Amino acid sequence: MRAALAVAQQASASGDVPVGAVIVNSSGEIVATGHNERELNNDPTAHAEIVAIRKATQALGQWRLEDHTIVVTLEPCPMCAGAIAQSRISTLVFGAWLSLIHI
C-alpha cells in the first residue's frame, strides 16, 4: 500500500484525483504501477487500475494476470472492477471505500 500511496502522489502533481495502483506477482515483486492520468492524457478511461493493468500486460506479454495482486488506494469503480476481473487478477486490496470519499 505504501507503494500505491507514493504513486498516487504523482497523480495529484498532474492535477488528477490522487489514486495509485500497484500490481505485484506471487513473489511480491512489483510488476507495474499506475496512477490516474485522465487530466494528463485527456482520457476518461485512464484510471490508476487501467493504467497499471496496461503496463503489466505489456511487461509480461500476456493479458492474463492470474496469481497477481492489485493494490489500489481507493475502491475500484465499476469500469476498473470489470477490467480487474477480465484480466484475471486474483487478489484486490484497496485502502478506502469509494462511497466514503467525496471526489
Across the structure, where does each feature detected by a protein language model lie?
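Short, basic/aromatic recognition patches
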Residues: M1-S14
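Short beta-strand scaffold segments in enzyme catalytic cores
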Residues: V19-V24
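A short, polar/charged loop-to-alpha-helix boundary motif
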Residues: L40-V51
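Conserved small/polar residues in nucleotide/adenosyl-binding loops
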Residues: I101-I103
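Immediate flanking context of iron-sulfur cluster ligation sites
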Residues: Q62-L74
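Short secondary-structure boundary segments
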Residues: A96-W97
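Local cysteine-cluster metal-coordination motifs and their immediate loop/turn environment
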Residues: T73-S87
